[in-house]
Regions:
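Charged, gly/pro-rich active-site loop segments
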Residues: 2, 71-147
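Extreme N-terminal tail/first-helix region
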Residues: 1-20, 139-147
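Alpha-helix boundary recognition
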Residues: 12-15, 59-60, 94
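Charged, low-complexity, helix/coiled-coil-prone segments
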Residues: 1-4, 29-39, 132-135
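Short beta-strand segments
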Residues: 17-50, 55-59, 64-68
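Short secondary-structure boundary/capping segments
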Residues: 11-12, 36, 56, 103-105, ...
C-alpha cells in the first residue's frame, strides 16, 4: 500500500498545468509533440483537432505517455468531447493558457483528451545519489529505489 502523503506530494509537485510532451503510438510508429496540459482531479487534459495524427493513433492505441520536468507519465487516453461540452476543462485551460482558449476551443474539430495515469516516475537526487520514485496507480503503490 501507499502513504496518502506520497500521492498528495506528487500532485503538489506536478502542479496544475504545464507544457508536456505527449507521445502516442500506432502501427509501430511512435510520435511526440508538445501540448498545453491542465491537471484536474488526478487526470491530465489537453485539447487538439480530432483529425490530427495523435487522435488517429489514440483511437487505435489509447496507451500514451507524457513527459515534463523530471516526470514521466504513462496512462490511458480518451476523447471526452468538445471543449464547449467540458466547461471544467475550458475554465482550467483559460486560467493557465487563455490564448489557447480564445484561439482554438471553439473550432468545430477541436476535442478534449483526458489521460488517466497508470504509472508516474520521477528521478530525484538525495545527497548526490540518484533514486527513481514510482507511483503505480493500478496497484496504489509508491516506491523509491536507489539507482
Amino acid at each position: 500500500m501507499h502513504n496518502t502523503n506520497d500521492f498528495e506530494k506528487l500532485w503538489q509537485d506536478i502542479g496544475t498545468h504545464g507544457v508536456m510532451v505527449l507521445s502516442t503510438c500506432a502501427d509501430n510508429r511512435v510520435t511526440s509533440r508538445s501540448m498545453s496540459v491542465t491537471v484536474i482531479g488526478g487526470r491530465f487534459y489537453c485539447q487538439t483537432n480530432k483529425d490530427y495524427l495523435k487522435c488517429r493513433q489514440i483511437a487505435q492505441n489509447p496507451n500514451v505517455a507524457l513527459c515534463f520536468g523530471r516526470f514521466t507519465i504513462e496512462g490511458v487516453c480518451r476523447d471526452i468531447g468538445k471543449p464547449c461540452d467540458n466547461e471544467f476543462f475550458v475554465k482550467a485551460l483559460g486560467k493557465a493558457y487563455p490564448d489557447a482558449v480564445s484561439r482554438w476551443s471553439s473550432l468545430p474539430q477541436e476535442c478534449v483528451l483526458e489521460i488517466t495515469p497508470t504509472l508516474i516516475q520521477s528521478w530525484i537526487y538525495e545527497n548526490d545519489i540518484p533514486y527513481i520514485e514510482t507511483w503505480d496507480f493500478s496497484e496504489s503503490t509508491y516506491a523509491k529505489e536507489k539507482q
